Amino acid sequence: MALHLTLARPYAKAAFADGQKANQLEAWLAVFTAFSKIIKNKEVARQIINPKFSDKEIKTLLFDLIQTIEPESTKQLKDKIDHFLQLLIDEKRLMILPDIALVYQQLLNKYQDIIEASVTYVFPLNDEHRQQIQKQLEKRFNAEVKLKMIKDESLLGGVIIRAGNWVMDGSIKGKLTRLAENLKG
């Protein structure tokens, strides 16, 4: 995964720089998000690595799929997507498209001063609790916060909140682990 992110970074940065210059940041995000979903599809992935298909056939398949999923963004970026796909095909790097999407999203979040935070829970939180968590995180980090909700029954209760390197473990599992460590002394 780390290698894929390293390989993906220059591609994401190049697309981001182009998106900034041409005021097409959101269009590129939509395209990369769609490509990520396409590449994660097992049938599509099989076709991409199948030597029976030529590079041209693979490129046509991917372009047709992206055009179906994201017609507006594809229309805006048609020639750029075509060039981008050809570059990835030539370099045998199509399978890192999900990683390119991830790095691109991180670049866009940083540019827009947005922090992604994950809230891991056992029991679903109501809208009021989500809003309280979001407001507290926005106050703490002085930035807009996007919450990602993750269900994990192994926590037993409570929540774990992660934002970048910052972690707040308010789970029962975490409390029991800390108690056990303290008792061991």
Curated annotation (Swiss-Prot):
InterPro entries, per the entry: ATP_synth_OSCP/delta_N_sf (IPR026015), ATPase_OSCP/dsu (IPR000711)
Protein's cellular compartments: Cell inner membrane
GO terms for MF: proton-transporting ATP synthase activity, rotational mechanism
GO cellular component: plasma membrane; proton-transporting ATP synthase complex
Coiled-coil residue windows: none
Pfam families hit by this protein: OSCP
SUPFAM superfamilies to which the protein is assigned, alphabetical: N-terminal domain of the delta subunit of the F1F0-ATP synthase (SSF47928)
Membrane topology: Peripheral membrane protein
UniProt keyword terms in alphabetical order: ATP synthesis, Cell inner membrane, Cell membrane, CF(1), Hydrogen ion transport, Ion transport, Membrane, Transport
Highest taxon of source: Bacteria
NCBIfam families cross-referenced by the UniProt entry: ATP_synt_delta (TIGR01145), PRK05758.2-2 (NF004402)
PANTHER family per record: ATP SYNTHASE DELTA CHAIN
Family: Belongs to the ATPase delta chain family.
Reported function: F(1)F(0) ATP synthase produces ATP from ADP in the presence of a proton or sodium gradient. F-type ATPases consist of two structural domains, F(1) containing the extramembraneous catalytic core and F(0) containing the membrane proton channel, linked together by a central stalk and a peripheral stalk. During catalysis, ATP synthesis in the catalytic domain of F(1) is coupled via a rotary mechanism of the central stalk subunits to proton translocation. This protein is part of the stalk that links CF(0) to CF(1). It either transmits conformational changes from CF(0) to CF(1) or is implicated in proton conduction.
Oligomer status and interactors: F-type ATPases have 2 components, F(1) - the catalytic core - and F(0) - the membrane proton channel. F(1) has five subunits: alpha(3), beta(3), gamma(1), delta(1), epsilon(1). F(0) has three main subunits: a(1), b(2) and c(10-14). The alpha and beta chains form an alternating ring which encloses part of the gamma chain. F(1) is attached to F(0) by a central stalk formed by the gamma and epsilon chains, while a peripheral stalk is formed by the delta and b chains.
Annotated protein name in UniProt: ATP synthase subunit delta
Native source species: Coxiella burnetii (strain Dugway 5J108-111)
